[in-house]
Amino acid sequence: MDSRPIGFLDSGVGGLTVVKEMFRQLPEEEVIFIGDQARAPYGPRPAQQIREFTWQMVNFLLTKNVKMIVIACNTATAVAWQEIKEKLDIPVLGVILPGASAAIKSTNLGKVGIIGTPMTVKSDAYRQKIQALSPNTAVVSLACPKFVPIVESNQMSSSLAKKVVYETLSPLVGKLDTLILGCTHYPLLRPIIQNVMGAEVKLIDSGAETVRDISVLLNYFEINHNWQNKHGGHHFYTTASPKGFKEIAEQWLSQEINVERIVL
């Protein structure tokens, strides 16, 4: 048993979609979350800069004595997960492999779509993982650079969001039966995405799939939280406005949280 918290990092608020699922599946675990909102979105940035920013968040989480780190950001996973995993002596999870595996199990037609940030799509990480596991699966990828700014500005239910999602995803409609939400921000737009793609298309939330892997690793390494130890509580950090982060986070997590601003 291990009562240390699990560390989560993201370029902004998107990683909260993973945290929400962890609260549901693993309510006994404690969370330290950092969102680098001041420098979001990561998708258009050069790979080396994304790697540098991700390491800054990792090093911050290590000062909090976390027992595991979850890179709850597809862009950071695509660019930095392998390197970080190899250099740390605690488990490090990314969100790409769990999403790819779930998509393969989901598709009946062998036609999978991936939507993500420009860097995630450019990295080709999802397609490589899917075709390594299922060579006959057809994969189409689409960058959606306007989605993250909509979420970060808390406009998920706006007419702008509906317009942008419709215009962006129209080329994919009718061409696949499974769509990976390849950015942890995108589940916050899920109702609109589902409406555009059609009810028959299965949406894969890579973050939710990742929580299943978290549970497996907690059991494997025997580092589940000890209920007998007093909780230290959850802690949330942002590099931007705590007020803006708190507003979106409480709306999404359906609970009050405390947020601190930090400088990396």
Curated annotation (Swiss-Prot):
Pfam families: Asp_Glu_race. PROSITE patterns: ASP_GLU_RACEMASE_1, ASP_GLU_RACEMASE_2. One of its GO terms (molecular function) is glutamate racemase activity. Gene3D superfamilies: 3.40.50.1860. Its EC number is 5.1.1.3. GO terms for biological process: cell wall organization; peptidoglycan biosynthetic process; regulation of cell shape. Substrate binds at D10, S11, Y42, G43, N74, T75, T184, H185. It is an enzyme of class 5 (isomerase). Keywords: Cell shape, Cell wall biogenesis/degradation, Isomerase, Peptidoglycan synthesis. It catalyses: L-glutamate = D-glutamate. SUPFAM superfamilies: Aspartate/glutamate racemase. InterPro entries: Asp/Glu/hydantoin_racemase (IPR015942), Asp/Glu_race (IPR001920), Asp/Glu_racemase_AS_1 (IPR018187), Asp/Glu_racemase_AS_2 (IPR033134), Glu_race (IPR004391). Transmembrane segments: none annotated. The active site is at C73, C183. Pathway: Cell wall biogenesis; peptidoglycan biosynthesis. Belongs to the aspartate/glutamate racemases family. PANTHER family: GLUTAMATE RACEMASE (PTHR21198:SF2). Provides the (R)-glutamate required for cell wall biosynthesis. This is Glutamate racemase. The lineage of its organism: Bacteria, Bacillati, Bacillota, Bacilli, Lactobacillales. The gene is murI.
